[in-house]
């Protein structure tokens, strides 16, 4: 797709300009070129989100909004998990402060004094946490850049975000304890140090929501890894192993700058290089290509005698293309090179044109048909199996192949693995002969296919890291709540031991409540995770089945880590000496 830069005068109505561009129009004289084109104007600040740039070399960077939405969603879930954890632990800490606030009110402290104390404590706590967070960011910056194969730089937004957290978070966390203790009588504040049933339920609800979010992140992370594994290990429908893509023409391709003499000279060099590579004794097959197999080809509208039209990827290839990539014919026979025009379609293109059988299949370029209604249609001589040129989730592209010996600036070479050193030496000799250098610009097809999923690897890695952080944060919250909860029940545990309760009975008593919270959280998170995964993959042509496995693994993983966090506290409580506890109470 052609891209040009324009600068408009202030006040130009760009919406009106884009409405004009939607109307198809001729670019060339319609007597010999009946193709019609549309255009649109994209603001420079928005061009990053337009994915068409992925199919061509460009000076602009590009990205996907879907990836931004995913990362934003994961960050939001992790933030909510941490926020709930903070609220839960802070409320537990406030239970111990009730007596202190009550006594201060008795000795004359007013509401302003209480608010300043609470706000100062939260401000210092937030500042300390923010300092630790920035320290972690600095320490992990290099490994994170390597892990995600990118470079993160600081922006003014980071500073404003830190200032916002430093100012707003202490205010948010100070509101509840301030109203609770400033508007209650000193006697109520002193008595609130207890651990009532209402407090237990509210904290368990917070913990349950926190674990539901953790399960949600963990399940999504497991599915993303499952989907990535499927894409990396699914056969794309063509051979990728031991195939090299070599660029061998370095002359300018700007025909406006070439004289006729220079053009003929460059063509002669190109033919000579292609012939040299074609006769290489270390190559199984060679195929000169203009469009790489991992990228979309030139799109052309074709029509059938019945008037069915479809936009197809048009590739000019030789018969060796199908041999090199091991693309089999479902119907028909692969033609040989001759002076006739032969067309081959893949199964997806046949469906797009509503063609069922090879016998009735014939097409013509819509451009030629509009120019001459009596033009002859070309028969489809074979149907090739579908293959995935790009991202697996997008499915197979509707492709039509015109069989032609077409020279280009690069060549695919299929070789035997043990012959690679000899092949490279041969190519170096060719480059030395024509360009005076042994530098060979080449890539392996396997690496290019894997590179298609680089962004998916990053997303899966981020999900894994965030899921781990969510589990750790939830376990810290569980640790804080259980530490206070179990300590408050020491007297109950001592009495039960005196009355004959065994270790098994005590373990069941103390584990039961937390297992119930985990179970309810899992039940709540499961349908939500299923819905989010189903919605995200709704347009995927190839997608991993959701399956029960990811839910079971998430449950077992989170439960083992969480129960391990509880175990040492419960074991310590179960082994207490009843006499010691009764004396201290």
For the regions a language model picked out, list residue spans one by one.
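"Rare, low-scoring activations can occur
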Residues: 1-61, 268, 274-281, 347-351, ...
